[in-house]
Amino acid sequence: MNLIFCGMPGIGKTECVKFFSQYVPGNERVITIEDTMEIRYSVTNPGKDCIEMRVNDRFDYADAIKASLRLNPKWIMLSEARSKEVKYLLEGWSTGVRGMTTLHTDDVRNIPDRILNMLETRVDADRLENDIYQAMDVGVLIRKKKNGAGQVYRYIDPVSYTHLT
């Protein structure tokens, strides 16, 4: 199952990825790809099969996603989909690899359009539009509110299933 957690910056999307990652079976290889090590899969899930990749100027998200597919993963977790790397993530997910990622949008229904806008060219967008709906199983919107006492709480608002199988 591929999950995309969305919401505004600082809302707790990565924390949700960390929470749901504990339900990945321990014998399934997970590859995390991040620029800032936030998921810390090996810390939050000790003893599970994990390879943590850190991207930089010489080893970008596209390189990491391509390299990860050679390592026989069951899961690819991208800390945040921001730009053209989403193309490679979708291609990876289309091979049957499962995954989780986060992205910034204020409505779960905007996930497909947000992904299309991240792609470099209109040709990529046209070619990958169906892949988005095939690859994404669940979209989750995270919100936060303050209660009367001024305490902040976070909650999951709508959940969207793109297809049921």
Spans of model-derived segments:
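Pre-Walker A (Motif I) flank of P-loop NTPase domains
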Residues: 1-2
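The conserved Walker
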Residues: 9
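Conserved glycine(s) of the Walker
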Residues: 12
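Hydrophobic positions on the alpha1 helix immediately C-terminal to the Walker A/P-loop
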Residues: 16
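P-loop NTPase switch/communication element
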Residues: 22-66
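Conserved P-loop NTPase nucleotide-binding/switch module
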Residues: 72-133, 141
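Conserved small/polar residues in nucleotide/adenosyl-binding loops
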Residues: 162-165
